[in-house]
Amino acid sequence: MFKAAINAELLKDAIASLAVIVDEVRFKIKPEGISVKAVDPANVAMGIFELGSSAFEEYSADECEIGIDLNKITDLLGIADRNDTVRMELDEGSNKLLIDVGGLSYTLSLLDPSTIRAEPRVPQLELPAKVVLNGADLRRAVKAAEKISDHMLMGVSGDTFYMEAKGDTDQVRLEMGRDQLIDLKAGEACSLFSLDYLTDIVKPTNKVNEVTLSLGRDFPILIDFEIANGAGRISYLLAPRIESD
Amino acid sequence: MFKAAINAELLKDAIASLAVIVDEVRFKIKPEGISVKAVDPANVAMGIFELGSSAFEEYSADECEIGIDLNKITDLLGIADRNDTVRMELDEGSNKLLIDVGGLSYTLSLLDPSTIRAEPRVPQLELPAKVVLNGADLRRAVKAAEKISDHMLMGVSGDTFYMEAKGDTDQVRLEMGRDQLIDLKAGEACSLFSLDYLTDIVKPTNKVNEVTLSLGRDFPILIDFEIANGAGRISYLLAPRIESD
Amino acid sequence: MFKAAINAELLKDAIASLAVIVDEVRFKIKPEGISVKAVDPANVAMGIFELGSSAFEEYSADECEIGIDLNKITDLLGIADRNDTVRMELDEGSNKLLIDVGGLSYTLSLLDPSTIRAEPRVPQLELPAKVVLNGADLRRAVKAAEKISDHMLMGVSGDTFYMEAKGDTDQVRLEMGRDQLIDLKAGEACSLFSLDYLTDIVKPTNKVNEVTLSLGRDFPILIDFEIANGAGRISYLLAPRIESD
């Protein structure tokens, strides 16, 4: 059993944060909320998604797992007004999700969860440095780096967080000191990341006040922020690239 | 003789409602206004257009017929500001239309009406059901249906008007009861229509308060609404598709 | 030595006015400001650009010449907010320009000026007619002409300035009398210009109050207006086309 109602804009944003990683996902539904863990097809980026029941206007659920094509949901939500309420109900017999938005009733066939890549194990990482910054600052640095290169260095040096991209001839660097950051835990950290992935991942951060980055030396980065006004959370784990120079 | 002046925005909207059916049309000009009847090249959709002289700021005309390339007019009106006045005068000797918009004088060669498909005969149909609804509701249902399928069922069942589209696995349905509609004349009606055509036809309805649909059982649909603040009217007649299941 | 700070929007607009002519330019830097003279690869249009030191928030420079790829600068400025200050400093040793925008530090490799086409000689022309008009009027006429043809006649006849484009069947003409113009110096003038070039050149004039056109009979046109709130000036010299009819 699963029956829920949620604001359309809020669901759209939550789905968008997942869709940057994968197209088809297993939603793990529990009485306390919905969670997803997924890796991208190339095994470079992982998304860990949690949306608590308090994000919903109505929510009642037994434990179950459903398979969703995120593109279809995104498409359907494109019709909704931002203040519409989206009502969902699982029809277990037919394996369909009934979705009602502003008078329109959708009957969405679900995917068989067993055909979707299994939930990955989240590695336990010791990431010594932590940086909390405004999402718009992060996005701006990534956009600037894209103009120059296809990868970007991120690190902490003393009390300064930095992002740097080098092209064949040009270079861009952003440095933020402790006073420009929301929080900083100093630690040895410097890793190189693919901008292909970073660009997608930071897209939803533009409206986010606090994004937490956890970093190490040639280690994955953990990019982490609240969604749904604090009722949910998305974390991305992105593998580093090996520096070739 | 034909000489007229009209608000640019109003003319743009009127032309746009015709352009969804055909590119080249015969304008029938009379002292009381302008009318067009045209079918699309595939004989699936017909447009019946009327723009009374009261839609114009100035209007004086003898009976005549001119051939117009709607794409050219649309292009030229693209330069106009929405509050500009468009002045038109027919130069019968040279078969040109002189158009003046905000100081720019266009000389537009007219098409020979005899090279344009003749005005079609409008079939007399007995369409038992009639639905009056808000144009934005109609457009929204058609946009939702497009996500799912390339055709759409429209019908009346008891006191309910419904639109439904079925894809290979998914389905969308909008039901509107008598109290959600502006008016309803119940009657047996259920026909299937191509979304290729419906999408174009409902595009101009977004700003229209009242759209009248006349429906029957496997019969054409008549989609009908006012243009030019009531000084004109456009009706579309769209042939049904045969249901294949 | 070259060190300067300038409003991002102002620099963006100034660069855009140059970029319609060429991609790579030699900036001539002097204590009193920056100047550029460049011709397009086909030798049809010339741009003469001047940006005085008063356009800058800070400015100090010795005489020097640097080679710039305008596309790169445009790209970088795309990240800036309109009220950001852009700080630039020349690093002569490495032949790089250090650019700082809102905390982001770019290191931009400069081009070797000797690899860029030398500054052209500006021909001394006797252009008998002069027209001063609003930039938006000019742009509107050019946009209308594009719908009809790929070249455009511009001239002065008595006290009237006119622009005219003829297509195979259609024609558009704008006439502006002395009272609709900001200023007019009558003189024999009528020349034909390629709309490919005019379209680009008039793009920046949309926000410009006064554009001065200097014209002759089958002569180049000089299109001239202030940039940077009067602290700079851009002039375009466009060669005429030979009328083929």
From Swiss-Prot, chains A, B, C:
InterPro entries assigned to the protein according to its UniProt record, in alphabetical order: DNA_clamp_sf, Pr_cel_nuc_antig, Pr_cel_nuc_antig_C, Pr_cel_nuc_antig_CS, Pr_cel_nuc_antig_N
Protein's organism: Methanosarcina mazei (strain ATCC BAA-159 / DSM 3647 / Goe1 / Go1 / JCM 11833 / OCM 88) (Methanosarcina frisia)
Entries under NCBIfam families matching the protein: PRK01115.1-5
Pfam families: PCNA_C, PCNA_N
Residues spanning the membrane: none
Job of this protein: Sliding clamp subunit that acts as a moving platform for DNA processing. Responsible for tethering the catalytic subunit of DNA polymerase and other proteins to DNA during high-speed replication.
Keywords, sorted A to Z: DNA replication, DNA-binding
Protein name: DNA polymerase sliding clamp
Similarity remark: Belongs to the PCNA family.
Domain of life: Archaea
